[in-house]
Amino acid sequence: MQQCLARRCSVAAAASVLGVSTPVGPSSSGSSVAVPFMCHHRAGLLRSTPVRLAMNLHASDLSTPDRATVNSANKKEFKTALCNELVNKITAQGYYPMSQFVKDCLTHPQYGYYAAKKNVIGSEKADFITAAEIPFFGDVLAAWVMDAWQKMGTPRVLHLVEMGPGRGTLMRTMLKQIQYSNPHLLHFLQIHLVEVGAARREEQKRALAEFQTAQGKIKWWMDLESLPFSLEPTVFIANEYFDALPVAQFRYTERGWVETCVEVDTDPGTEAHFRLVHAPSGSMSAYLIPDDIRTKGKKGDCVEVNTVGMQTMETLMKKMIDCQKAACLLIDYGKDDHMHSTLRGIRGHRFVDPLLSPGEVDLSCWVSFRQLRWALERLEVARRHLKWFPVMTQHDFLLENGIDIRLAHVIKDEETKAAMKVLQNYRRLMDKEEMGDSYKVFAFQTRNFPNVSPFFAEMPLPPLPQRDGR
């Protein structure tokens, strides 16, 4: 009964802030199957592959590329500008951590995928779409932001931070919904976009031009550490941000946990210029492997450790405590568990070998929400100032925040063809076979204001790890 009442309250709150009174992963089996249809969002892509994957990431010996036999006689692919740079760097160094390779491929200031490539999201020429491109999604997140503002006591200034804002579509949708439902809040908002890519920033500026002011209502930052404000209420949102952060991969061998690295591949019978190998020595990063995995390794075991993601969580924690009142919403595809071998390359809505064409292929991994939560649980300061909530599926989060109410009021005024498009987008967000189950939502906030809907039950804290000492 209490859960039923809680859900009714959250849906009613969502209806209120949405203004509806007026119209308005992959399987871990490691097998790959040929299929004629490809899902277009990145989690959906992991459900199917058009050809045999170039990486046998669940092999028990090495996490080394297993090249498709159809390419075995091909010459090496043409080297991209970033490929040349990486070959020189790795040749001089001998080997390169996989996490650093992924970071360079995505964020190299001149040749990185997100720094240089345009049309990577949303369009027909894009490599994938995200939920941000579907208006329903932004409307519901706007409702969540408005509820957070109300729970904080309707402060006269509210900072809204989006990490990895893509094309600016999600922020534009949220601001339009806030403008419609609560224009006073729009006046109080200060917008901050954390974006590393120069080309992407220009795209975001065009998308959000109508909301920019002479005083600079919208500002851009290279990273979270650069955000200047403190002691003012803040809401953080990250949609499909953590999946693009580099992860370290480890395999358990006779030497214990050994990091997966990249070395130059000069074999003329393989297409890529790189391959994955074991590091010749131990890694300092191995201490970041959570205890429940680190102490129970068996030969052949593989685990991904979201080292950058956990560092980002610590930065978020510090920023939120500095803001006194703050809430954060993380949405991504992943599981509330450890992830193993999930590195994937995506180009043109298809899987490709993640070691091919550096800088021209999107690289991502499924997110371990368990590790992100562990990054907070192990810190006494986080336990003292923050509270976090059980991970929800995207389906449940959107449902609890009133997406069905939104659907009913939008679709009744649409023509048949437009209504079918609306329903198609709704199903993409909600169906378990699409984004509804593979995408998860993790929320946390400071302890000094009521829980933001629909998060009612705080997650119980496990014992503080003894070895951490912090």
Regions inferred by a protein language model and the residue ranges of each:
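Short, well-ordered beta-to-alpha junction loops that form the rim of enzyme active sites
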Residues: 165, 240-241, 331-334
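Conserved protein kinase catalytic core
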Residues: 201, 245-246, 338
